[in-house]
Structures are given as C-alpha cells and as structure tokens.
C-alpha cells in the first residue's frame, strides 16, 4: 500500500467519524463471519485503555513489545499517540532493552516478555512487582490486557492482516474500530 492510499484511508476514517458512518478496518474485514464476536472482543479490549487502572503508556509499551516478540508488523504499525513513545523508546521496546523505563514499566514489560511463549514462567515475584506499582485492580487489568495483546497479535498473523499504519489520537476503540 503506498502512502497515497494510506492518506486516503485516514481521510475516509476522519470523514466517517464526522458524519457518523462506520468504517471497516483491516481487523474488522478479517472477521466478517462473526460480527457478534468481534463486537464483544472490541468492547472488552476497549476497557483496558479506558478504566484508568494502568497508564496508557504502560499498556502501549507492553502491546508493542508483544507485537515485536511475534514479529507482527500489522500490530506494531499501530501507535497510540497519547503514550508519547519516542523513536528511541520504540526501538528499545522492539529489541527488549528496558533499562531506561520506570520501575513499574520494567515490571510490566518483564511479564509482557513471558506472555507469548513463557507464560508458565510468570512467578509470584513478577506479579508482586506489578502489584506494588499498580495496585490490585491495575494488576488484574494489566494481566488481562497482556493476554488480549497476545491474542490480537496472533489473530493478525493467522488472518494475514495487512500492515495498516495508524496513529491513534484517542483511546483505542473509542469509536468502535479495532485497527
């Protein structure tokens, strides 16, 4: 897809949001036979970003790390603008270098590292480090979000989802689209 097509798609999405029309995103296109499942999935996914228990930046760091572990370009190409990740920070996340992040972010990223292929290696110490920074509700939210980030990356790979770069300026799924 060339840059002209991407610009056209972004303009179409903005127009649809202004007029109230629905825009089908690549992820939605891949799941046309189970609309009710997609709707429930999207509603649940949106709760992580909007409940305030985990900072959006922490969620975005973890989502991008899981995408990098899976080498899922379709998931990696979506950015949450509110997370304010610099190019250097995104590169650190891609390559598993976390020393410059906060203690809570490092704890979350350590667990995110294990979710895709080593989830049985998550121990009480890992969870306690998250709990000490995010509290009980934040820990539950983060652990659930990590599982959904993993599932989303896997679904994108299985469905051969196209790379559709997007910079989200609002909470993911605020308008119902799952990029």
Q: What are these language model-derived features?
A:
Residues 136-179:
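Preference for long, well-ordered alpha-helical segments
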Residues 55-61, 137-142:
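Alpha-helical scaffolds flanking conserved acidic
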Residues 18, 35-41, 71-73, 107, ...:
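Short acidic alpha-helix initiation/capping motifs at coil-to-helix transition points
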Residues 1-56, 60, 80-84, 174-179:
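Mobile cap/lid helix-loop segments that border enzyme active or cofactor-binding sites
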Residues 57-90:
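Conserved alpha-helical segments that form or flank metal/cofactor-binding pockets of metalloenzymes
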Residues 89, 93-102:
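Acidic/His metal-coordination segments adjacent to aromatic residues that form catalytic metal sites
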Residues 45, 61-67, 93, 108-116, ...:
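Short alpha-helical scaffolding segments that buttress acidic/His motifs in well-ordered protein cores
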Residues 104-145:
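Acidic/histidine-rich alpha-helical segments that form the ligand environment
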């Amino acid at each position: 897809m060339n840059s002209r097509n991407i610009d056209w798609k972004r303009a179409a999405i903005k127009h649809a949001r202004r007029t109230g029309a629905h825009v089908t995103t690549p992820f939605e296109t891949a799941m046309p036979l189970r609309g009710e499942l997609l709707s429930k999935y999207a509603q649940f996914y949106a709760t992580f970003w909007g409940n305030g228990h985990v900072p959006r930046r922490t969620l975005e760091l973890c989502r991008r790390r899981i995408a990098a572990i899976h080498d899922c370009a379709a998931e990696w190409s979506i950015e949450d603008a509110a997370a304010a990740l610099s190019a250097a920070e995104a590169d650190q996340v891609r390559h598993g270098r976390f020393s410059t992040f906060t203690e809570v972010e490092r704890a979350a990223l350590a667990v995110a590292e294990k979710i895709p292929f080593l989830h049985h290696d998550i121990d009480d110490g890992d969870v306690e480090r998250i709990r000490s920074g995010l509290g009980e509700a934040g820990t539950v939210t983060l652990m659930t979000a990590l599982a959904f980030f993993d599932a989303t990356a896997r679904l994108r790979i299985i469905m051969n989802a196209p790379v559709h770069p997007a910079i989200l300026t609002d909470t993911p799924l605020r308008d119902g689209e799952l990029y």
